[in-house]
């Protein structure tokens, strides 16, 4: 900006300001590098000139343009760090109406509603022009909070959280843009400032207010794309707040039960994921569920509405009669639509991962939630097992080959990505009720060996402390029973018969020579640090050997001890 334009801004020449700011804002709309503004203190002079205009109430019609310029200037981290801007930040907080030095927020949304009813005549609905100014000021504050720790602390000192939360919880309707940037600012503060999370959750009871607001949003007959964006930002804020709960366990669990019920309604409403935005809402809801206590996830599956009205029909002579369903997605008298949404989301995420070779960020949260559901409730585990590990029929292919959920999860068992590998292993193991034999049946010992080594059950011992119902869920199909004897437990499938065994044509001397060569090759790999030969110790975990020949001494004794145990 040339000196003449800057001088006119400093002189607050109203007739020239709109053209000057319009030209500047268009020219620098995408500016990210401000090196040219650092010479001759140009950034600071322009900053002060703009805030001089913002301080003049008579130039209120220019404030939206001025704030657009401020938003551009707040991208310059260097200038924000090297100039004293506390007064200007206070001015932005005032323009955004999030400065609340003496605000007292009621403990619950109901108390706030009563307070608003008593002050109905004192409330002032912002005009459209004022709402635009508030939204632009919020955009500037978002940039400042992202760039500067000092600005974040100033926002907390001036009770910015209190004011935003009161506006969110107010019965007064606000434009979507204003609500969106309220949530964006709240997200940045809670993501970057731990003290903000603590204050929002403990001092302001923010989770209760935000849960109520989310519930109100879902009660509306339709949701525009702008409303879906707001819901996404709100879910992100709630994720930050619940990441490290500081409330007492009982108090937090009561809030979590209510929140889980609201998230259930959200998943049911947007579970079809008809648009990318609806899919984003489901993604953020699943992320939030990862922070919810396992004991609260029972709220995802309510009793079917007419389950109690179903007549009890005793079927004599039929040991495994299926209970009558009272609705389309009723399983053991519980509505499992939410679990169906989670499984559909998992299938879509798996398809996306294969098509785009994307990261595992979409898969880890939904697998975490499925693990927690499986561990927390018998009915949920039964349903997930039915969908993920149905009774085996085709055992001609390895478990990791195919496009079913079981096949995908078995492939994850041998991934180098530890988080995804461990989550897939835990989900499958829990669905197998932590039964080693059942896990081998569905995955093959080779795929599950990593889990067994980690758990200390390589020798297929029973897992201690596993607490599951004694009812049998495992019914072998006729196809499985037919081929059961021919299944290779290491591969997890029927091993194709070899046309010719090369050892058949060897003499005993040749076999011994081949065995010695194999020993030498394994020893070379061991010396190079590529492999580590091991035996299973008394704890069921692999114990490295100093030399490959130790196998010759230790293995027969270990096999003898294993036979005695069985």
UniProtKB/Swiss-Prot annotation:
What UniProt keywords are attached to this protein's entry? Cell projection, Chaperone, Cytoplasm, Developmental protein, Guanine-nucleotide releasing factor, Synapse
InterPro entries reported in the protein's UniProt record: ARM-like (IPR011989), ARM-type_fold (IPR016024), Chaperone_Ric-8_A/B (IPR008376), Gua_nucleotide_exch_fac_Ric8 (IPR019318)
A GO term, aspect molecular function = G-protein alpha-subunit binding
Gene Ontology terms: biological process: asymmetric cell division; establishment of mitotic spindle localization; establishment or maintenance of cell polarity; G protein-coupled receptor signaling pathway; gastrulation involving germ band extension; neuroblast division; protein localization; protein stabilization
Gene Ontology cellular-component annotations: cell cortex; cell projection; cytoplasm; presynapse
Q: Where is this protein localized, as stated in its record?
A: Cytoplasm, Cell cortex; Presynapse; Cytoplasm
Question: Transmembrane ranges?
Answer: none
- Major localization class: cytoplasm
Gene3D superfamilies linked to this entry: Leucine-rich Repeat Variant
- So what family is this one in? Belongs to the synembryn family.
What does this chain do?
Chaperone that specifically binds and folds some, but not all, nascent G alpha proteins prior to G protein heterotrimer formation, promoting their stability and activity. Also acts as a guanine nucleotide exchange factor (GEF) for G alpha proteins by stimulating exchange of bound GDP for free GTP. Plays a key role in asymmetric spindle positioning, a step for asymmetric cell division that generates cell diversity during development by activating G(i) alpha protein independently of G-protein coupled receptors. Required during gastrulation and sensory organ precursor (SOP) formation.
Known partners and oligomeric status: Interacts with GDP-bound G(i)-alpha protein. Does not interact with G-alpha proteins when they are in complex with subunits beta and gamma. Interacts with Frq2 in a Ca(2+)-independent manner but does not interact with Frq1.
Protein known as:
Chaperone Ric-8
Organism expressing this protein natively: Drosophila pseudoobscura pseudoobscura
């Amino acid at each position: 900006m040339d000196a003449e334009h800057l001088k006119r801004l400093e002189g607050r020449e109203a007739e020239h300001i709109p053209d000057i700011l319009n030209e500047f804002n268009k020219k620098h709309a995408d500016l990210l590098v401000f090196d040219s503004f650092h010479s001759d203190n140009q950034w600071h002079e322009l900053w002060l000139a703009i805030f001089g205009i913002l301080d003049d109430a008579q130039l209120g019609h220019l404030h939206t343009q001025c704030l657009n310029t401020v938003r551009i200037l707040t991208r310059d981290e260097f200038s924000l760090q090297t100039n004293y801007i506390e007064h200007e930040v206070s001015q932005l907080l005032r323009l955004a109406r999030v400065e609340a030095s003496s605000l007292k927020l009621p403990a619950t949304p109901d108390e706030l509603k009563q307070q608003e009813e008593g002050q109905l005549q004192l409330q002032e609905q912002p005009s459209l022009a004022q709402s635009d100014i508030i939204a632009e000021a919020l955009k500037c504050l978002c940039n400042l909070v992202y760039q500067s720790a000092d600005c974040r602390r100033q926002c907390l000192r001036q009770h910015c959280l209190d004011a935003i939360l009161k506006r969110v919880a107010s019965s007064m309707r606000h434009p979507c843009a204003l609500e969106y940037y309220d949530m964006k600012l709240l997200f940045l503060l809670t993501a970057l400032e731990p003290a903000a999370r603590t204050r929002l959750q403990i001092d302001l009871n923010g989770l209760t207010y935000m849960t109520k607001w989310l519930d109100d949003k879902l009660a509306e007959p339709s949701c525009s794309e702008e409303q879906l964006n707001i819901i996404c930002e709100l879910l992100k804020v709630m994720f930050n707040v619940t990441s490290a709960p500081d409330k007492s366990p009982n108090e937090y669990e009561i809030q979590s039960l209510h929140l889980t019920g609201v998230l259930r309604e959200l998943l049911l409403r947007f579970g079809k994921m008809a648009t990318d935005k609806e899919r984003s809402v489901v993604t953020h809801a699943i992320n939030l569920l990862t922070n919810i206590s396992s004991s609260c996830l029972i709220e995802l599956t309510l009793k079917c509405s007419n389950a109690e009205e179903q007549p009890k029909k005793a079927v004599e002579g039929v040991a495994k009669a299926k209970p009558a369903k009272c609705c389309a997605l009723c399983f053991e008298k519980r509505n499992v639509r939410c679990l169906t949404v989670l499984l559909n989301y998992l299938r879509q995420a798996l398809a996306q991962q294969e098509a785009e070779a994307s990261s595992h960020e979409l898969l880890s949260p939904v697998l975490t939630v499925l693990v927690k559901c499986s561990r927390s409730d018998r009915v949920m585990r039964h349903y997930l097992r039915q969908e993920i590990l149905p009774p085996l029929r085709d055992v001609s292919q390895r478990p990791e080959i195919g496009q079913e959920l079981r096949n995908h999860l078995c492939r994850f068992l041998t991934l180098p990505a530890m988080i995804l590998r461990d989550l897939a292993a835990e989900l499958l193991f829990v669905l197998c009720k932590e039964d080693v034999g059942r896990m081998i049946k569905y995955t093959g010992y080779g795929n599950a060996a990593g889990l067994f080594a980690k758990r200390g059950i390589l020798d297929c011992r029973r897992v201690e402390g596993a607490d599951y119902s004694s009812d049998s869920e495992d019914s072998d199909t006729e196809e499985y029973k037919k081929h059961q004897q021919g299944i290779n437990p290491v591969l997890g499938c029927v091993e194709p018969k070899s046309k010719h065994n090369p050892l058949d044509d060897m003499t005993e001397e040749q076999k011994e020579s081949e065995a010695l060569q194999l020993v030498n090759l394994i020893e070379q790999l061991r010396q190079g640090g590529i492999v580590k030969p091991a035996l299973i110790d008394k704890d069921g975990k692999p114990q490295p050997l100093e030399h490959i020949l130790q196998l010759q001494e230790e293995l027969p004794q270990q096999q003898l001890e294993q036979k005695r145990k069985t």
